[in-house]
């Protein structure tokens, strides 16, 4: 006898399953304003995976103090640049952009991505922001930052990836002064200025694109069995729904776009933040090459293929107290090509 009921196949929490509008991921929420003012995000390029041997530092664990092997993703994270401070104001309809304070030092390739302002008065823009702060209408403060692909030889692109990164922590006036200092000093900031090894971070990326796929691969429905499969349609669904309502519901698993979706994974532990070629495997990472600059080792996997942009954010819902500076005793350099 067939099973009378079961949970539906595939999650509806990720719909609509369509292509991401941009390869640069976006964050819709940010951590709380605790601690000192600072930038709440960074970005890098995914190189590949390897494994490390580290000492288990989880309190009360049966394996505490023992060595264990952990898979890690290697992400190349050269310094980023902040070219402007964008201030938001609180309105009855939510936060709206108020004004921007731009730097006068721009990367030579930045005009490939955005129009660099020529006639800009940063003093007038700063005064407008401070007036909004005194009136109590100042909302979020965000830096317009961009990557520097020139610093990553393995990524064959010249066009910088531009994104907004929130400035959090401390009071509003402290955040404003901190953001203005970053912009005035040239805007360069590094991964270890924001994160520390052992902390938890949320990682966002655009997954591998797989094109149009059928309902079996896209939703995980069962293939037809027995005489139902002998009709010649083993990988199709049985029907599109009932007679009434006389329409096809959006919950019916059908073929369509698979992959190339933005996904955010929470609470990924940062195993190591360093610089050099230590994590590079023999022969280089497949489809990437060698890592010979600032890098970050993230525990586990990260969305997206090699060379794709990955964004970091301090964990918004940390499920554990950070255990800083894990003891890494070995980083595998075994070739991924056998």
From Swiss-Prot:
Recorded GO CC terms: cytosolic large ribosomal subunit
Listed Basic residues bias regions: 220-237
Pfam family, one: Ribosomal_L3
GO molecular function: rRNA binding; structural constituent of ribosome
The keyword Ribonucleoprotein appears for this protein: yes
Cysteine disulfide partners in this protein: none
InterPro entries named among the record's database cross-references: L3_arc_euk, Ribosomal_L3_dom_3_arc_sf, Ribosomal_uL3, Ribosomal_uL3_arc, Ribosomal_uL3_CS, Transl_B-barrel_sf
Region (Disordered), start-end ranges: 1-44, 151-170, 206-259, 312-338
Compositionally biased residues, Polar residues: 22-31, 247-259
GO biological process: translation
PROSITE patterns per UniProt: RIBOSOMAL_L3
Keyword list, A-Z: Ribonucleoprotein, Ribosomal protein, RNA-binding, rRNA-binding
Family to which the UniProt record says this protein belongs: Belongs to the universal ribosomal protein uL3 family.
Role, per record: One of the primary rRNA binding proteins, it binds directly near the 3'-end of the 23S rRNA, where it nucleates assembly of the 50S subunit.
Subunit structure: Part of the 50S ribosomal subunit. Forms a cluster with proteins L14 and L24e. Interacts weakly with protein L13.
Protein name: Large ribosomal subunit protein uL3
């Amino acid at each position: 006898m067939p099973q009378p009921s079961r949970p539906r196949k595939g999650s509806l929490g990720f719909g609509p399953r369509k292509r991401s509008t941009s390869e640069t991921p976006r964050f819709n929420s940010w951590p709380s304003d605790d601690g000192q003012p600072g930038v709440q995000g960074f970005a890098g390029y995914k190189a590949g995976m390897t494994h490390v041997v580290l000492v288990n530092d989880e309190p009360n664990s049966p394996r505490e103090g023992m060595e264990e092997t952990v898979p890690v993703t290697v992400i190349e994270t050269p310094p980023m640049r902040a070219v402007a401070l964008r201030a938001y104001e609180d309105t009855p309809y939510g936060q709206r952009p108020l004004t921007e304070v731009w730097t006068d030092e721009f990367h030579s390739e930045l005009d490939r991505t955005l129009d660099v302002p020529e006639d800009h008065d940063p003093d007038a823009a700063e005064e407008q922001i401070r007036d909004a702060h005194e009136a109590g209408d100042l909302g979020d403060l965000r830096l317009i930052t961009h990557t520097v692909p020139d610093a990553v030889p393995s990524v064959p692109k010249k066009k910088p990836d531009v994104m907004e990164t929130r400035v959090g922590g401390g009071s509003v006036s402290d955040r404003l002064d901190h953001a203005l200092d970053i912009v005035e000093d040239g805007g360069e900031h590094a991964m270890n200025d924001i994160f520390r090894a052992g902390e938890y971070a949320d990682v966002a990326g655009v997954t591998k694109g797989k094109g149009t796929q059928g309902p079996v691969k896209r939703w995980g429905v069962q293939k037809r069995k027995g005489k139902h499969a002998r009709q010649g349609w083993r990988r199709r669904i049985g029907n599109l729904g009932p007679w009434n309502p006389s329409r096809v519901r959006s919950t019916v698993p059908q073929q369509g776009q698979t992959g190339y979706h933005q996904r955010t994974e929470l609470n990924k532990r940062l195993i190591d933040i360093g610089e050099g070629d230590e994590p590079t495997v023999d022969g280089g990472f497949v489809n990437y090459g060698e890592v010979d600059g600032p890098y970050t080792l993230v525990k586990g996997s990260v969305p997206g293929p090699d060379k794709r942009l990955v964004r970091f954010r301090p964990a918004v819902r940390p499920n554990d107290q950070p255990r800083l500076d894990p003891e890494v005793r070995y980083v595998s350099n075994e070739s991924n090509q056998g």
